[in-house]
Swiss-Prot record:
This protein's UniProt keywords: Host cytoplasm, Secreted, Virulence
One GO CC annotation: extracellular region
InterPro entries assigned to the protein according to its UniProt record, in alphabetical order: Tox-PLDMTX_dom
Protein name, UniProt field: Secreted effector protein SseI
Role: Effector proteins function to alter host cell physiology and promote bacterial survival in host tissues. This protein is required to maintain a long-term chronic systemic infection in mice. It inhibits normal cell migration of primary macrophages and dendritic cells, by a mechanism that involves interaction with the host factor IQGAP1, an important regulator of the cytoskeleton and cell migration. Also accelerates the systemic spread of infection from the gastrointestinal tract to the bloodstream, probably by interacting with host TRIP6.
Amino acid sequence: MPFHIGSGCLPAIISNRRIYRIAWSDTPPEMSSWEKMKEFFCSTHQAEALECIWTICHPPAGTTREDVVSRFELLRTLAYDGWEENIHSGLHGENYFCILDEDSQEILSVTLDDVGNYTVNCQGYSETHHLTMATEPGVERTDITYNLTSDIDAAAYLEELKQNPIINNKIMNPVGQCESLMTPVSNFMNEKGFDNIRYRGIFIWDKPTEEIPTNHFAVVGNKEGKDYVFDVSAHQFENRGMSNLNGPLILSADEWVCKYRMATRRKLIYYTDFSNSSIAANAYDALPRELESESMAGKVFVTSPRWFNTFKKQKYSLIGKM
């Protein structure tokens, strides 16, 4: 069966010359990995196997553990007899999946955790996707209609923050204030017993050709073993296509992800957590950049709209002139 990428079509038999083309410096890691595992599959199965590898490395929203198991089992089915033993589900625990080379060295792996993180490790490159809080098929996710979690006394925390006139002014007029709020909010969280404070840099892209994505910052801290996000200027996006972000947010880490995911289906949102606010501000500054040249290593995806998946397929397509 042909492998469709964009408007192209990859024949089942992949020529050596075409494979050589993927050795460019900007070759995505999964394509480099493919060179190491393509001999596991006969020529008539290579296209389907390559499509499966691409899906493993770029999981669609709503992917579950069962989907991952199914994809690795498909690869085992497509592989030559003997080589299927190099494709593992549950080698180091039920949420660990990997493909090994002939020397039993890891080529590619996927690790799942209990909070919906799906981490792909591939040729020294790591990319994390935040998929869903529901890990079992048929479990529906709940829309987060509230802004303040009930797990902690978030309402009281917000009111106390507002007692500071400088912080209150920024909360009341949130546009462009998120960076300057990081330090006072983190100080407040420290005073309230939160530890492992991190500074979350966030990019929001409307389209792949956007010159300057929207940047945003929030503060993350841990209390009694659970992460919480203080995003007290989130409501600056209420009139920018994300109407349910209608107030300051103090939510658990999972609730925060769900809140943003429910806010938009067409924007690309990803983040990185830093131990230092200055590093966060520099890494996620509001300067021109190209999505095409952005490294996704170490970033956690909150949303992955269809246009982004199309963009990645076009960018990483093997289709070209022979």
